[in-house]
Curated annotation (Swiss-Prot):
This is Probable GTP-binding protein EngB. It comes from Aliivibrio fischeri (strain ATCC 700601 / ES114). The keyword rRNA-binding does not apply. SUPFAM superfamilies: P-loop containing nucleoside triphosphate hydrolases (SSF52540). PROSITE patterns: G_ENGB (PS51706). NCBIfam families: GTPase_YsxC. GO terms for cellular component: cytosol.
């Protein structure tokens, strides 16, 4: 029996400059990553039906920390630093890139990665690097083509198909869908994907209860 996850109860736990400052590497984490202007904060707020869970900034590139949110017991969402914004100093870009790579390659409890890309400008070099990193670690990836409301229905579908075809080159488990925080496009599909990734946490709970009942 699948558990209903109440994403609206998601709340902030802590911020960390790198994985060494995160809580214990246990439970299940789903990470969100994307270019600084891809609409990551808006997507997290829409997912959880909260207006300011993830703070949106008028200056892209401000999110320099790894932000951790608790969804349920043993289930967390990780908001990774935005990347690729032109006005950020090169040294800071390198630091963020190292932090992202380190998290994807070393965090054992990472169950899935959501990569957000503006539907009008998808698959930039650093976006692709991020997906390849995840695939190399056998981490499933959900690509969200954000700001889908900016395109008419036909153009939106064509762009999704184009990116799906390109995503075949990544290998691994990579899915592509349109998303709009403003219009709610793709929100239910995103919740369903997160439900799937978080499910093992509740299976462990059920096994624990069964063991207690058997004693």
């Amino acid at each position: 029996m699948s558990k209903t996850i109440h994403y609206q109860k998601t709340h902030f736990i802590t911020s960390a400059p790198d994985i060494r400052h995160l809580p214990e590497d246990e439970g299940i984490e789903v990470a969100f990553a994307g270019r600084s202007n891809a609409g990551k904060s808006s997507a997290l707020n829409r997912l959880t039906n909260q207006k300011s869970l993830a703070k949106t900034s008028k200056t892209p590139g401000r999110t320099q920390l790894i932000n951790l949110f608790k969804v349920e017991e043993n289930c967390h969402i990780v908001d990774l630093p935005g990347y690729g914004f032109a006005q950020v100093p090169l040294e800071m870009k390198k630091k963020w890139q190292k932090s992202l790579g380190e998290y994807l390659q070393k965090r054992q409890c990472l169950q899935g990665l959501v990569v957000l890309m503006d539907i009008r400008h998808p698959l930039k070099d650093i976006d692709q690097q991020l997906v390849f990193w995840a695939v190399d670690q056998n981490i499933p990836v959900q690509i969200l083509l954000t700001k889908a409301d900016k395109l008419k229905s036909g153009a939106r579908k064509a762009q999704v198909l184009k990116v799906r075809e390109a995503a075949v080159d990544f290998g691994g488990e990579v899915e592509v869908d349109a998303f709009s925080s403003l219009k709610g496009i793709g929100v239910d599909k995103l919740r369903a994907k997160l439900d799937e990734w978080f499910a093992p946490a509740f299976e462990l709970d059920d096994e624990f209860i069964e063991d207690l009942d058997a004693e």
